[in-house]
């Protein structure tokens, strides 16, 4: 942005417009919250609770995917996956499960869960910002959830009972 401004391609307002966009600030804040979740030990506590109830592979897949998906609805998809990977590896080691079977479900659930709320996925925020700039209104915070939550539930059940075989 600085180079484009100094070379005269963009005005200062155009070059730095993205840095003051509320979506950019919100996106940065989500990464901070995700890091705090891990640093405070909440991630480990969640892993211990999941480990207590997950007695077989199918239940563990459902628990991991639902937890990841719900977290992803309110935090960054990438940040959620990054936080959940070490948690799931720890759960698998503690429970004697093969960790390679549980890493892809994290990514799937984070992607699906991102559609629960406005802040779950950067694409949701960008679409909303574009609607507002065009003067077409905006989505409510949970507008995406009408499709996103059922998609997370159905996707989780599909993966737990059918998809894990492939």
Predicted features, each with a name:
Residues 9-95, 156, 160:
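Membrane-embedded alpha-helical segments and adjacent helix-loop junctions characteristic
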Residues 3-4, 37, 116, 151:
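Hydrophobic residues within membrane-embedded alpha-helical segments of Major Facilitator Superfamily
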Residues 94-166:
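Juxtamembrane and boundary regions of transmembrane helices in multi-pass small-molecule transporters
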Residues 3-11, 129:
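Membrane-embedded alpha-helical segments in integral membrane proteins
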Residues 1, 77-84, 104, 116-120:
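Hydrophobic alpha-helical membrane segments of integral membrane proteins
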Residues 2, 63, 67, 105-108, ...:
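Hydrophobic residues within alpha-helical transmembrane segments
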Residues 1-6, 87, 149:
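Small-residue-enriched core segments of transmembrane alpha-helices in multipass membrane transport
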Residues 2-6, 69-70, 111, 134:
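Alpha-helical transmembrane segments of multipass membrane proteins
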């Amino acid at each position: 942005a600085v180079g484009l401004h100094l070379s005269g391609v963009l005005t200062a307002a155009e070059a730095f417009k993205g840095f003051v966009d509320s979506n950019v600030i919100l996106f940065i804040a989500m990464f901070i919250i995700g890091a705090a979740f891990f640093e405070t030990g909440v991630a480990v506590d969640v892993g211990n609770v999941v480990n207590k109830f997950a007695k077989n592979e199918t239940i563990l897949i459902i628990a991991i995917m639902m937890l990841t998906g719900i977290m992803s609805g309110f935090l960054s998809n990438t940040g959620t996956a990054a936080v959940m990977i070490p948690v799931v590896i720890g759960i698998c080691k503690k429970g004697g499960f093969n960790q390679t079977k549980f890493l892809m479900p994290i990514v799937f659930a984070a992607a699906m869960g991102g559609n629960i709320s406005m802040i779950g996925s950067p694409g949701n925020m960008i679409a909303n910002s574009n609607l507002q700039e065009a003067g077409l209104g905006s989505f409510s915070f949970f507008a995406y959830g009408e499709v996103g939550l059922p998609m997370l539930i159905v996707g989780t059940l599909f993966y737990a009972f059918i998809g894990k075989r492939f």
